[in-house]
């Protein structure tokens, strides 16, 4: 599967990713979170995702940015993403550097869409 094809999570949820989470190597993309608005029932919110995979091994998820105004973790994971190469790991590392991307883009603690706080959901 190329990086332009989507990973389909439809059997489990309505989320989709535009990178193959099972492929070897390093890829950057977005998880698409469905979101309806008045102008379109088919909108989505992009959540940045990075996959680094090298052979068999443990699966690790790293996440930051539950609160958009807490930059330390987001910056730290951004630095890690730039520094890590597939040959540096064994297994699969999935990174969500800005889990609440709309809040991060606004520099706000909660989502500007619905005032939601991911730590209180």
Please state what every model-predicted region is.
Residues 1-121:
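Structured catalytic-domain cores with a bias toward divalent-metal coordination
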């Amino acid at each position: 599967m190329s990086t332009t094809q989507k990973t389909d999570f439809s059997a489990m949820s309505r989320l989709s990713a535009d990178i193959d989470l099972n492929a070897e190597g390093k890829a950057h993309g977005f998880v698409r979170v469905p979101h309806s608005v008045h102008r379109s029932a088919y909108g989505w919110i992009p959540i940045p995702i990075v996959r680094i995979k090298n052979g068999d091994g443990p699966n690790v998820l790293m996440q930051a940015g539950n609160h958009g105004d807490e930059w330390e973790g987001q910056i730290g994971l951004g630095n890690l993403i730039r520094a890590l190469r597939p040959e540096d790991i064994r297994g699969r590392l999935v990174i969500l550097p800005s889990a609440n991307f709309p809040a991060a883009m606004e520099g706000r603690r909660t989502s500007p869409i619905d005032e939601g706080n991911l730590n209180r959901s």
